[in-house]
Amino acid sequence: MTTKHHLDTVSAAGLLVAMGIIYGDIGTSPLYTLRSIIDTHLVEPNLVKGALASVFWTLTLQTSVKYVILILRADNRGEGGIFALYALIRRHARWLTLPAIIGGSALLADGVITPPVSVSSAIEGLTLVYPQIPTVPIVIAILTGLFLIQAFGTSVVGTAFGPIMLVWFSMLAILGIAQISLNPAVVDALNPYYAYWLLTQYPGGFWLLGSVFLCTTGAEALYSDMGHCGRANIRVSWIFVKICLVLNYFGQGAWLLSIQGQRLGERIPFYELMPDWFLPTGIGIATLATIIASQALITGSFTLISEAIRLNFWPKVQLRYPSLQKGQLYVSSINWLLWAGCIGVVLYFKESKNMEAAYGLAITLTMLMTTLLMAYYLYSKKYNSWGVVLFLGVYLALEGAFLVANLIKFPHGGWVSVLIGLLIGGVMVIWLQAFQIKLRLAEYVRLDQYIGAIKELSRDISIPKYATHLVFMSNAGRQSEIESKVIYSIFQKRPKRADIYWFVHVDTTDDPYTMEYKVNTLAPDDAYKVTFRLGFRVEQRINLFFRKVIEDMVRNKEVDITSRYESLSRQNVIGDFRFVVLEKFLSFENELPVYERLIMNVYFFIKGFTPSESRWFGLDSSSVKIEKVPLVIRSVENIQLKRLTS
């Protein structure tokens, strides 16, 4: 992974990558946004112009101003996204954890809704050519195929994403221009007065904001994927993308003005812009665009989970890297949970217009939480206080209005995304609280008090040698400390004699790509403590990293790793390395409060479905000893036990 990101360098390749990765979601919104706003209403000029004005100014205020101009300033060494932003400021205030968890879980919930909505909207265009064709099986087949290829990496097809999306946006613009030329009066809708009229004068107009919001649901991706493309490439490419989107929306508006006095019925404004001869091609391009949008969201979900793990928000599930390309991450458990969720959404709602009711509510919460975190970031960076208050006030009001308007969707399907978000958020809260409980209850001792005993044990030939090099994974952050459980394992559980003892600690930093280590020599050629400082986006391949540390130390003549058996030493045979990983369980002898006991029981239940710590750290299973140790809180006190004499 690179350690320096050229955020402000613009290149043709970068612009194309941005087109393919970032704008899939927001770029496919024209498929369903205006149809959702108009819905069953009678088409009339002020409704159409009000809808267009609302879309235009939402894109301007929400996407252009908030995300492209303001939020992209908050980069964590080139990386963006709600967890990257949280990592920048989490040490300043503990309460920031709550908005980070709400925003992250809502964003993951959105990953279950967006692919079905996007793909269904594209495939339903086939009904214009083949009215009797069943769309649900086709949508399920496409989504299943998409999730199946994740395990093999998407670097090959990924190279085509940019050009395909360039074709898509060009098509949006051309179709829009052709229709606008037939009804230029639609340009009046640039006037924000029409948006004001829609919200205040049109019956139930305020509640239409829930559908208007669909035009900007992909805005969060601009920030989340900043590390892939760079800030400058996003800002420059957005100019082109926004022009294409606005032209298409206004083209649809021009067509709607041509049918004023009617209702939409089964007609889809997006496809009505296409001449009949182009319809099959247009549907094909739309399908490819929605697949790309879904792919970007899946990849984003994998990245989000990997960050959540390192921030102690999520269980340590297995992560795989199918290719060396940056961003190519695969999380099997999340992949198939997303697949099951997407298929469930398709089977439950069947049509995209039904799915739209479940869409938007979750992502509104994410945007609100990003606003809170960003305001605190600006405050911590000593920006003008009035400017911070203005930013917070404007966007809390705007996004609060969108949230309230989206709440009307709750009984019609919005509950689905809320339920998914609550489940994900619940896991995050439980995992974080369990981590904090374990941290509070962990007992540490000073290493220097045991170095003499460790050296004596190492030379006690009456005890069988356990390993030449014995490596303990430790949670003790201080160089001078170690868990009491490690000392217990060395001396009491079964005395473990070794030539050299190693204590390895991994410290996850708020900087995404830190890769550093420090060695503390406790006793030359007897005991060492190695501390790795790894960024929250770095794969924790401790087996590989530890080998590198040993090589460096041998080269610098800091340690001799040759076996100390005389016959092997003469042959310069390297001694064996054995890792010990301590896995805790909740002992019955504890006095935890009921709430904390419940948290820990749920924590250990979930942990039973996750890989062991040794697999997470990439340790060779043949050289790992996993020891179960009780999470003993304190000895049970005041037991009245009477001894009987016979």
Q: Which positions does each model-derived feature cover?
A:
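The structured alpha-helical core of multi-pass membrane proteins
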Residues: 1-646
